[in-house]
Amino acid sequence: MSWRASSSPAEPFDVAVIGGGINGAGIARDAAGRGLSVLLFEKDDLGGGTSANSTKLIHGGLRYLEYYEFRLVREALIEREILLGIAPHIIWPLRFVLPHHPGLRPAWLLRLGLFLYDHLGGRKALPATRRIDLTRSPLGAPLSPGRAIGFEYSDCWVEDSRLVLLNAKDAAERGASILPRMAVTSARREGALWHITAEAPHGQPAAFLARTLVNAAGPFVGEVQDGVIGSNQPARLRLVKGSHIVLPRLYDHDRAYIFQNADGRIIFAIPYERDFTLIGTTDEDHADPHETPRISDAEITYLCAAASSYFRVPIRREDIVWTYSGLRPLYDDGASKAQEATRDYVLKLEAPEGAAPLLSVFGGKITTYRKLAEAALAELRLRTEKAGWTARAPLPGGDFAPEGFAALLADFQRDFPNLSPDLSRRLLRAYGTRAWRIFTPGQDPGPPIGADLHAAELEYLRREEWAATPEDVLWRRSKLGLRFDAAAQARLARLMGG
């Protein structure tokens, strides 16, 4: 999957996007669907940075109410239901249990916050908040003694890196040129056009023209602005690291927990990949975007201690099976603490008269990427079809009702009886209705490469989803890395030419 053969310096694109995370992919999709010619550059794998290392929630952000970010919360709550409707295979409802901590926020304040949370966004698809007696409910069983009162509310889970992939794929199917592993080395204005030079690893530089340029490079937005483009505008960027730990499953039910801590922060404990529990996140300032974010010993201690103060069985660091960290490229609003920095997005337009415009994207949440894309195109004032189509058009594989997953799974198992129930469920959760394109009905899948990854799925990922390395397959197109042993990893590397 490469750029169109007609793409040449003589044929300008309407929009060029630097950055293949969720914001860049969302902008590319929206623009392509409005009939614009679109080019997207990503120096690494699509969704390989910030977007793949989130807490994997589509949520309003309950704690943002404490910082009076009512507009952000309302927009995110509205988007939560829209995204559930257009991508029900990779986004699904998740109930959260919030135990009351007598020494922290009073119960009346929690009730007030949850009342606002239920009503700010016009909730329709998800159930309302309810009070729980944790001394009698099974939901209280994993918790330490003394947790008497709790509240249960709704948000959604998302396969974050797949959300990026599906936006990029839909953009490509609508005519966009998506170029992963293609780094922009320079972009300069010449009148009403951007002259862009990009280079693939071990490849020759290629030249492109574009009428508008969007800098959605995430943690590298400042570097692109200063070094690649040469803009004089200051980049008010604050990098905040968020780290997570993954452990064997800590409890048997399907709810997530949200825990308050004495430092004012909250952490989540979330069912993960059926056999695990995900705990996170932290908030630490991070200086250098080139320094790969990794969990620190202090962060591990913090997450283990915070979760252990709520769970009946303490969390031990030796039980951790995986950790990951990501950088949030937040707009620097001058907040003194990393946890208080705004999660809202800020768009900066630089459009001198008669010159090609530049739009730089700061901040944002994965939940609000679609609205950010609409706002970005509105800022650029391109002559296009009307906004709003992305709220109605399903992402690839998402053309079924959110409540229809069980029926879809039954249909798939009927058509592919040779596949195990667990594999069928995983394929439907990853690919939705496009899972039918991976195997042919009645096909013997053959021996797996590792876990339940088969050659047919690997071929699909390489052909349709830009998968180029084992890491792409194991940690972004899926989370099979949690189940691949060393021998299976070596087999996969050989198959992929490693």
Report each predicted region and the residues it spans:
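Extreme N-terminal leader/targeting segments of oxidoreductases
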Residues: 1-15, 30-33
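Short hydrophobic core segments
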Residues: 18, 208-218
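Glycine-rich Rossmann-fold phosphate-binding loop(s) that bind the pyrophosphate
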Residues: 20-21, 43
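Glycine-rich FAD pyrophosphate-binding loop
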Residues: 32-52
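Dinucleotide-binding Rossmann-like beta1-alpha1 core, especially the glycine-rich loop
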Residues: 56-140
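Helical element adjacent to the flavin cofactor pocket in flavoenzyme catalytic cores
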Residues: 151-207, 211
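C-terminal catalytic lobe of FAD-dependent flavoproteins
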Residues: 154, 160-162, 170, 229, ...
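Flavin (primarily FAD) binding-site architecture
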Residues: 215-230
